[in-house]
Every structure is written in C-alpha cells, then in structure tokens.
Curated annotation (Swiss-Prot):
Protein name: Malate dehydrogenase
Family: Belongs to the LDH/MDH superfamily. MDH type 2 family.
Function of the molecule: Catalyzes the reversible oxidation of malate to oxaloacetate.
Presence of keyword Coiled coil: no
Keywords, sorted A to Z: NAD, Oxidoreductase, Tricarboxylic acid cycle
GO molecular function, one term: L-malate dehydrogenase (NAD+) activity
Species of provenance: Acidiphilium cryptum (strain JF-5)
Amino acid sequence: MAKSPVRIAVTGAAGQIAYALVFRIASGALLGPDQPVILHLLDLPQMQGALGGVMMELEDCAFPLLAGMVATDDPKVAFKDIDIGFLVGARPRGKGMERKDLLGANAEIFTVQGRALNEVAKRSARVLVVGNPANTNAYIAMKSAPDLSPDCFSAMIRLDHNRAASMLAAKAGVNVGDVGKLIVWGNHSPTMYPDYRFAEAGGRKLAEAINDEAWNRDVFIPTVGKRGAAVIEARGASSAASAANAAIDQVRDWVVGSDGRWVSMAIPSDGSYGIPEGIMFGVPVTTQGGVVTRVPNLAIDAFAQSRLDITLNELKEEREAIAHLLA
C-alpha cells in the first residue's frame, strides 16, 4: 500500500542552498525510495519568478516521489500541516553590517516564521534551522512557537561534523564512512569545538592513532572552524551543496534514525554538560523513531571545558543581543 505524502517546507527556496536541497528531497535521498513528498516552497515576493523556474525544473525531473508542490511568500501557507521544515532562508551579512544588526534582522524573520509554525504546523513537526546564525535563529523560532515542543527544533551543526569527519579520516588514513563517535559541540560558528577524543574507525581509537595534540589544537580545530570562510575564498560563494547535504544527513538521522551511531545535533539544552537549559547547543546524540537521546556522562577534560566555555559564551552573547526582541 502506498504511503501518504510527507509535507516538507523549504524556506529561501529560490536560493543556492535550497537549489542543492530540493532535488535531493524529491529524489528520495531524505526519506527513502518509497516515501512520496509534497514540497512547500517559501521565498520573498520578489523571488517568486525565480522560484517558478525551480519548480519547472522539479517538474522536468519527473520524480516519481514528488506528489505536489506549493509556492508561496506567506509563512502560514508554507508551514500549513508540515511534517518537516528546512528553514534555509536568512538575512546574509551585508558589507559594514555589525553582528548585532545581523542578529536583529534575522530575529524578525525567525520570530515571524516561529509564530507561523506555532499556528499551522503539525504538532509533531521536525524543524531544522540552516540559515545563519543557525543556533540563535533556531532559538528564536523555538521561543516564538510556545505551543510546539522545544524538541521540534534543531539547528544544523552536521556540516561542521561532516567537515571534521573528512579531515580526521584523511589524517588517520581511514574511510570517512568508518569514522564514529565524533562530536561537534556548541555553536555553528568558528567557535564550535570538534572533539575526536572518543572517535573510532574500524575498532581503532583515532586520538591514539593520530596522537598529535599540536595538530588538534593548531590545525584541526581552526581548520574545521574556518572551513566555510575557506570555501567562500576559493569559490567566491558560500557552501551550498555541502550545506544541503548536511541538512539532509541531519534530518534523515533525526526522522529515520541513526542506527546507534553518534551524530552531532544542535538542540535545546536540558542542562547536561553544564550548558544552561534552553540554549541551542551542539551535542552528541543518538536518534531512533524521531526521538533524540543525548550521549550522557562523557568526560570533559580541562581543554575540552575551555573550548565549551568559548562557544557557550558566544551563544550567551547572541541570546542577550536578541532578548529584547523576544520580550
């Protein structure tokens, strides 16, 4: 018997990340080869023409799983009865724009979208925020949707996780698909902390195999943290395909399950690891049946604690900068 279609919203749907995302969703890369989807595509009024072109291309792919599309500039239409949301659209940082101005501009966007989700989305919806600053944008959307469980919201830190896994695999001479128990803690920003103290590949402890604290501190952590800037420098544009891929990875694991593997997700803190409750913070989790379970009781040494403090302080500053907008 055919499955009922899953409704999936994508915001910023005429943008570059969405262009790398929607075709993969429609092909079955997110939910598998037998799950039909209906795409709800949201973008600004002035982007509706370009969005129409994206929809023409989606039609021309003749995806058997694409059961329908909705194009709109109204969040309440876009989020009506959705099962999954990818909040990709965000205000980019303009020339001369201060970080607090960027936070304020995005607070307006994600307050409106959070309220719309609160009003019309399914109560079981899973909403991933991709648009930067992703952790704080997700926090704003969550706070603006008080009738939805905080567990409905996550921010994307999987791109950092994938970047770290690729770099670790190259350093250790292993297949990236074999790397497990890697963690990315904190904010999706250069302050995040990629932590391979527990990482394994093929039964080997990677920290023992690499055994190079200077490389960890001076090469690995800063390179992962600045990878997005390096892509912009080389490509002349920000990461789009890799961001879309990470969004698919994170939501697929969230909805379908991680099969016992540790994955990194930025989720509202429950107070564990000394992170104040409610802050959207990257932590190691396992997922099954849409339920996220934090990996508990991991040892935090002095260096790890110092890195957690750096990224936590940044998130606290971001939260304080937009607190008056949520009052």
